[in-house]
Amino acid sequence: SLSDKDKAAVRALWSTISKSSDAIGNDALSRMIVVYPQTKIYFSHWPEVIPGSIHIKEHGKKVMGGIELAVSKIDDLKTGLFELSEQHAFKLRVDPGNFKILNHCILVVIATMFPKEFTPEAHVSLDKFLSGVALALAERYR
């Protein structure tokens, strides 16, 4: 679980990186579909599933909007992300294992874009936070 120190670190990092959240989302999703091509199946309804496409950019923006929501609900992710969990479980039917894959891609992109801010301490706190987000999103699968 997230300590007060972790929550403060996530909030501090988010205040810096949120201005670039659209680019982070685009880069993370683009990376995910290249490194983990099996994830493309969730986007087969798009005319093209290629890095940097308009659909990837739009969905990356949505994903990062979800991360922003999670930051604002950091004290109770399970309740705060209930509707997103329902949507992913029952409407989108995303395998919850893919949340971990996308989390990894988000971490890589943030580390690349913000090397100074992505300290080892920020890394561990953000990783714990994203793991908490994945767990909260998987809640409705049970």
Curated annotation (Swiss-Prot):
- Disulfide-bonded cysteines: none
Chain positions found as N-acetylserine: 1
What PROSITE patterns does the annotation carry?
GLOBIN
Q: Which domain of life is it from?
A: Eukaryota
GO CC annotation: blood microparticle; haptoglobin-hemoglobin complex; hemoglobin complex
Any Pfam family: Globin
> What tissue expression does the UniProt record report for this protein?
Red blood cells.
Keyword Acetylation carried by entry: yes
**Annotated ranges, domain Globin:** 1-142
Give GO terms: molecular function aspect only: haptoglobin binding; heme binding; iron ion binding; organic acid binding; oxygen binding; oxygen carrier activity; peroxidase activity
Query: Could you provide one GO biological process annotation from this protein's UniProt record?
Result: hydrogen peroxide catabolic process
Question: Which residues are recorded as binding heme b?
Answer: 88
Under InterPro entries, the record lists: Globin, Globin-like_sf, Globin/Proto, Hemoglobin_a-typ, Hemoglobin_oxygen_transport, Hemoglobin_pi
Q: Which UniProt keywords apply?
A: Acetylation, Heme, Iron, Metal-binding, Oxygen transport, Transport
Residues engaged in binding O2? 59
Q: Which family does it belong to?
A: Belongs to the globin family.
Question: Quaternary form?
Answer: Heterotetramer of two alpha chains and two beta chains.
What is known about what this protein does? Involved in oxygen transport from gills to the various peripheral tissues.
Query: Which PANTHER family would you find in this protein's record?
Result: HEMOGLOBIN FAMILY MEMBER (PTHR11442), HEMOGLOBIN SUBUNIT ZETA (PTHR11442:SF41)
Protein name in the entry = Hemoglobin subunit alpha
Please give the organism. Answer: Gymnodraco acuticeps (Antarctic dragonfish)
